[in-house]
């Protein structure tokens, strides 16, 4: 499923935070998620991407799938 949004839905639903989507990185790879001043808040994308560039393209083009639950 293609998804295009600007705010993290899981961050809003589960944490009550309006946070912009951005590319983040974990040991598993790059993903689309949110963070605040304390660090990562939510992983929003179902997918992990092999590179920052691939994740950024997916974010810009809406080529990623929203996780339903954290």
Q: What kind of region is each of these model predictions?
A:
Residues 39-52:
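A short, exposed loop/beta-hairpin motif centered on an aromatic-Gly-Thr core
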Residues 58:
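An amphipathic, aromatic/His-enriched active-site/gating alpha helix that lines ligand/cofactor pockets
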């Amino acid at each position: 499923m293609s998804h295009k949004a600007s705010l993290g839905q899981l961050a809003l639903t589960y944490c009550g935070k309006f946070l912009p989507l951005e590319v983040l990185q974990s040991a598993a790879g790059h993903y689309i998620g949110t963070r605040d001043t304390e660090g990562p808040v939510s992983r929003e994308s179902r997918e992990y991407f092999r590179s920052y560039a691939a994740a950024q393209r997916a974010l810009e083009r809406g080529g990623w799938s929203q996780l339903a639950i954290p």
